[in-house]
């Protein structure tokens, strides 16, 4: 049975597949629509340029009324990323809005790579270096970028492009078989 959160995630996936913002990609796991794998490419003209950073987004049935949990799987050195990969990002906390979709979340994270907020640090060392020793901060970030190229951390199996049509058809069939349709945000 398809729930409002799953219907919304299907819509988010269709949008992300047909009109992806530059430098990001994401898809639900093949066996669980509520867990997504994503990749953010480091923004140009930043120390993160050329990096390939893996993330996992975990949704629950309260989405889109509550934000997903988002965590970098790739090692990060950033003022707003905790050692465990979780983010300190206002839209994932007190500034969340149900109008945000997966593309908006990933774009916001990419923007955070471009413009860190050292005044709200999750990583005090990175924030301190960002403010006081940019040369060392950049050196540490570039080491993270290089590590992202070698990152062979396994991510759960995602829907591949060839399987997208099949997954969409299956998802739509689930939606079509569900109880009476109601409009949802």
Swiss-Prot record:
Signal peptide: none annotated. The keyword Nucleus applies. Pathway: Protein modification; protein ubiquitination. SMART domains: UBCc. One of its GO terms (molecular function) is ubiquitin conjugating enzyme activity. It holds the Pfam family UQ_con. The active site is at residue 88. The keyword Nucleus applies. One of its GO terms (cellular component) is RAD6-UBR2 ubiquitin ligase complex. One of its GO terms (biological process) is cytoplasm protein quality control by the ubiquitin-proteasome system. InterPro entries: Ub_conjugating_enzyme, UBQ-conjugat_E2_core, UBQ-conjugating_AS, UBQ-conjugating_enzyme/RWD. Residues 4-150 form the UBC core domain. Its EC number is 2.3.2.23. Keywords: ATP-binding, Chromatin regulator, Cytoplasm, DNA damage, DNA repair, Nucleotide-binding, Nucleus, Sporulation, Transcription, Transcription regulation, Transferase, Ubl conjugation pathway. It catalyses: S-ubiquitinyl-[E1 ubiquitin-activating enzyme]-L-cysteine + [E2 ubiquitin-conjugating enzyme]-L-cysteine = [E1 ubiquitin-activating enzyme]-L-cysteine + S-ubiquitinyl-[E2 ubiquitin-conjugating enzyme]-L-cysteine. Residues 149-173 have a biased composition (Acidic residues). It is found in: Cytoplasm; Nucleus. Its main location: cytoplasm. Residues 149-185 are annotated as: Disordered. It comes from the Eukaryota. Catalyzes the covalent attachment of ubiquitin to other proteins. Plays a role in transcription regulation by catalyzing the monoubiquitination of histone H2B to form H2BK123ub1. H2BK123ub1 gives a specific tag for epigenetic transcriptional activation and is also a prerequisite for H3K4me and H3K79me formation. Also involved in postreplication repair of UV-damaged DNA, in N-end rule-dependent protein degradation and in sporulation. Belongs to the ubiquitin-conjugating enzyme family. This is Ubiquitin-conjugating enzyme E2 2. The lineage of its organism: Eukaryota, Fungi, Dikarya, Basidiomycota, Ustilaginomycotina.
């Amino acid at each position: 049975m398809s729930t409002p959160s799953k219907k919304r995630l299907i819509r988010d996936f269709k949008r992300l597949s047909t009109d992806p913002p530059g430098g990001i990609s994401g898809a639900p796991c093949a066996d669980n629509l509520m867990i997504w794998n994503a990749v953010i490419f480091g923004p140009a003209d930043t120390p993160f340029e050329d990096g390939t950073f893996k993330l996992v987004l975990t949704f629950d049935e309260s989405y889109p009324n509550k934000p997903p949990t988002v965590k970098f799987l790739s090692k990060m050195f950033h003022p707003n990323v905790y050692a465990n990969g979780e983010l300190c990002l206002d839209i994932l906390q007190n500034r969340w809005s149900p109008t945000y979709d997966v593309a908006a979340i990933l774009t916001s994270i990419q923007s955070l790579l471009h413009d860190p907020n050292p005044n709200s640090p999750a990583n005090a060392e990175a924030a301190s270096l960002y403010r006081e020793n940019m040369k060392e901060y950049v050196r540490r970030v570039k080491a993270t970028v290089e590590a992202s190229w070698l990152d062979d951390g396994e991510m759960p199996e995602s829907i591949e492009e060839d399987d997208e049509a099949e997954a969409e058809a299956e998802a739509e069939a689930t939606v079509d078989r569900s109880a009476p349709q109601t409009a949802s945000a």
